[in-house]
Amino acid sequence: MTVMRKSHPILKIFNNSFIDLPTPSNISAWWNFGSLLGLCLIVQTLTGLFLAMHYTADISLAFSSVAHICRDVQYGWLIRNLHANGASMFFICLYLHIGRGLYYGSYLFKETWNIGVVLLLLVMAAAFVGYVLPWGQMSFWGATVITNLLSAIPYVGATLVEWVWGGFSVDNATLTRFFTFHFLLPFTIIALTMLHLLFLHETGSNNPTGLNSNPDKIPFHPYFSYKDLLGATLMITTLLTLVLFSPNLLGDPENFTPANPLITPPHIKPEWYFLFAYAILRSIPNKLGGVLALLFSILILMIVPLLHLSKQRSTTFRPFSQTLFWLLISNVLILTWIGGQPVEHPFIIIGQLASVTYFTLFLVVMPTTALLENKLLNW
């Protein structure tokens, strides 16, 4: 008799995805981030659901309703801080997951990779509209500045901005629709995550060597289920430490002031996880140019598979490409730092140089180095 998990129509899908899944025996801890992202998504959806039960999407009540959640709702402070800092954990895991993909050549699974890039864009959209909901100063001005970027689109820009705002400025209509989007997007993200997994399981996972894994695979459970459990424990511990000891560490003090259209904060800046893109946006003196650079700073990931000119998949055995990879990481960290600084000398020129370096590494230096390494293989 076949085991029920192998024959039942629904359990069979679960079994083939999480229990009897053939997995490369040598995948390292860098392969843990997929499951950690799944965990983040579950935590964010559940905490978000409970917050939505008490939140009011109205400009006269939004700020007060968040204060009410933190003061009067049972464990509301915990739910709110888990949700706010859970977003940071989500992005940490996302960036590490993408970094892993770039380092080990996982992007050659094109469908999986491109769905992943779309997922990144959706998570960024969800985080942006979510940041507006508490209706603090930085929420309001962040929404104003970022939505205003749409006005850079030729011909339809101005109309588009008014359409997104639902009026002639960021107002009640804007808050209401942002709450709608913030509620809707996670479910779209969950659906795409399933597709992401579906395409991944068509090919199987890559591994640190970049070689074919088929000769040496082991069942996902118990080996990697326990490995994932360890990763999950470490992540939850980190998240709880942040939430319980320093919940406002990554937030902006400006957001403790209710939104006021008449007072502009001295430095308008997004949450830390958007700072690298914000720095690229600001480094270009032209509005439309900045918006395009901002867009391409993320969309460039979609053409990475086309720019892979090396005969080897992973950078494990390519010291030159490894050096460039870490240069890229350093560059993104510099951009993140610049994004949080005021627009003045020397930050302007540093941001411009880092932005040029970012695109040059992806489009020119890395592919050229890959070709050079191919030549070296023949020596």
Curated annotation (Swiss-Prot):
Task: Name the residues that bind a ubiquinone.
Answer: 201
Q: Which residues bind heme b b562?
A: 83, 182
Q: What is its main location?
A: mitochondrion
Give any extra note attached to this record: Heme 1 (or BL or b562) is low-potential and absorbs at about 562 nm, and heme 2 (or BH or b566) is high-potential and absorbs at about 566 nm.
Q: Show the coiled coil region(s).
A: none
Functionally, this protein is described as follows:
Component of the ubiquinol-cytochrome c reductase complex (complex III or cytochrome b-c1 complex) that is part of the mitochondrial respiratory chain. The b-c1 complex mediates electron transfer from ubiquinol to cytochrome c. Contributes to the generation of a proton gradient across the mitochondrial membrane that is then used for ATP synthesis.
Q: Where are the transmembrane segments?
A: 33-53, 77-98, 113-133, 178-198, 226-246, 288-308, 320-340, 347-367
- Subunit-structure text: The cytochrome bc1 complex contains 3 respiratory subunits (MT-CYB, CYC1 and UQCRFS1), 2 core proteins (UQCRC1 and UQCRC2) and probably 6 low-molecular weight proteins.
- Which GO MF term does the entry hold, naming one? ubiquinol-cytochrome-c reductase activity
- What Gene Ontology cellular-component terms does the record carry? mitochondrial inner membrane; respiratory chain complex III
Q: How does it sit in the membrane?
A: Multi-pass membrane protein
The species this protein was found in? Iguana iguana (Common iguana)
Q: What is this protein called?
A: Cytochrome b
Q: Where in the cell is it found?
A: Mitochondrion inner membrane
What InterPro entries does UniProt report for this protein, alphabetically?
A: Cyt_b/b6_C, Cyt_b/b6_C_sf, Cyt_b/b6_N, Cytb/b6-like_sf, Cytochrome_b, Cytochrome_b_C_euk/bac, Cytochrome_b_N_euk/bac, Di-haem_cyt_TM
**Keywords for this protein:** Electron transport, Heme, Iron, Membrane, Metal-binding, Mitochondrion, Mitochondrion inner membrane, Respiratory chain, Transmembrane, Transmembrane helix, Transport, Ubiquinone
A biological-process GO annotation: mitochondrial electron transport, ubiquinol to cytochrome c
Recorded hits in PANTHER family, A to Z, give: CYTOCHROME B
Q: Which Pfam families match?
A: Cytochrom_B_C, Cytochrome_B
- List positions binding heme b b566: 97, 196
